[in-house]
């Protein structure tokens, strides 16, 4: 199911359940009884709502920062691979072609194989093998001139950065909100919505609309939190487009004899 459909379903089901819960309470608890609890319920929902709002805002900020950081790391990795390809063009034709082939193989493995596996929080053995091959290839490079020596030093720095950012990318795909925090988020939302049942509002329709609005907002924010929790899964995900852009540029470099 597409992410936006899942989000719509979650919000719809939550609003429906909240409405049914309100109907059950209003049928079983007389209005005069609810009116006597009005002040206490109002105070409690004010306190609980404030605490829950702070917690929810904190979690949203954390997952959004993690999502943004993951996107930035992917862009850095792509930029460093682009630098590697440009540095490779400064070497002699045989070495240049060997380097470009290795870089191209690594990027292709990341796009075709590692990106799908990261949605499950896993690294790709094919991409790992391509990275190991890149390191092996650069360790075997024998610079022949002062110019190649300088370029070689820069290339090793860039390759080290690529390796580091790949590791950060994989780690980000494995980070999840702890179970205890998930329970607190969903449980807190449920309790906050349930407290709206205990207000002595004469118009059930008006109370139902207020309850539905609160349930819809809370469930939608929780859905956003879940959607952003894994930055490489779902509709709201980091794409490999920066990698694809670099790969497309490398393919335009003329093949050396």
Go through each PLM region and give its residues.
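Short extracytoplasmic/periplasmic juxtamembrane "stem" segments immediately C-terminal to an N-terminal membrane anchor
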Residues: 73-90, 239-253
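Short, charged, low-complexity loops and linkers
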Residues: 38, 59-66, 113-117
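Transmembrane signal-anchor/signal-peptide helices with a preference for the extracytoplasmic
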Residues: 54-75, 229
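Alpha-helical transmembrane anchor segments
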Residues: 3-29, 40, 171-257
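Juxtamembrane loop-helix boundary motifs flanking transmembrane segments in multi-pass membrane proteins
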Residues: 28-40, 76, 154, 158, ...
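Structured inter-helical modules in multipass membrane proteins
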Residues: 83-174
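A generic, lipid-embedded transmembrane alpha helix
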Residues: 42-59
């Amino acid at each position: 199911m597409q992410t936006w459909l899942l989000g719509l379903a979650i919000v719809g089901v939550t609003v429906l359940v909240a409405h049914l819960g309100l109907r059950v309470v209003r049928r079983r608890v007389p209005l005069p009884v609810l009116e006597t609890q009005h002040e206490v319920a109002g105070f409690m929902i004010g306190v609980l709502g404030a605490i829950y709002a702070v917690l929810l805002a904190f979690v949203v900020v954390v997952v959004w920062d993690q999502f943004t950081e993951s996107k930035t790391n992917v862009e850095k990795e792509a930029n460093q691979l682009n630098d590697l390809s440009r540095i490779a063009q400064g070497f002699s034709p045989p070495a240049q072609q060997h380097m470009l082939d290795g870089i191209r193989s690594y990027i292709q493995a990341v796009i075709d194989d590692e990106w799908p596996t990261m949605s499950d929080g896993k690294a790709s053995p094919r991409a790992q093998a391509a990275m190991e091959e890149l390191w092996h290839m650069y360790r075997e490079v024998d610079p022949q001139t002062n110019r190649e020596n300088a370029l070689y030093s820069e290339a090793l720095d860039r390759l080290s950065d690529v390796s580091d950012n790949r590791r950060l990318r994989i780690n980000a795909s494995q980070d999840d909100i702890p179970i205890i925090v998930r329970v607190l988020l969903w449980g807190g939302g449920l309790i906050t919505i349930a407290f709206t049942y205990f207000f002595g509002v004469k118009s059930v329709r008006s109370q139902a609309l207020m309850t539905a609005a609160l349930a819809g907002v809370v469930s939608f924010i929780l859905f956003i939190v879940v959607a952003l929790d894994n930055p490489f899964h779902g509709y709201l995900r980091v794409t490999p487009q920066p990698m694809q852009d670099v790969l497309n540029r490398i393919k335009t470099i003329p093949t050396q004899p």
